[in-house]
Amino acid sequence: MEFNIEQRNGNLNISIIGAVDNENAEELKNQFQELLNLGFKEAVFDLSFVPFITSSGIGKFLIFYKNVISQGKKMRIKGINENLLELFKSIKLDQLFPIEK
């Protein structure tokens, strides 16, 4: 799993490349902790190159979302594939934050 991070116009654009699984969930948590220390209005995750996410990975996204909201910031996901979109909708994540294909 790789992270590409870019700050632009108050937004934090984060591209994740590779599967988010149990093996790298701790790395994801650490990356998210670092992101929270950056100044931004909205975190935008591009998941175009993420084939799948395990429940551990989803849990890390939820913790990050909770922290982002508590700081008065926003979060959104874009570039999600059809399988992940169905998964996110089935657990109602689309009701927490915007998800775009």
Regions found by a protein language model. Give the residues of each.
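Amphipathic alpha-helical interaction surfaces in cytosolic regulatory modules
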Residues: 22-32, 36-96
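Short acidic-hydrophobic, aromatic-tinged amphipathic segments that line or gate anion-handling sites
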Residues: 98-101
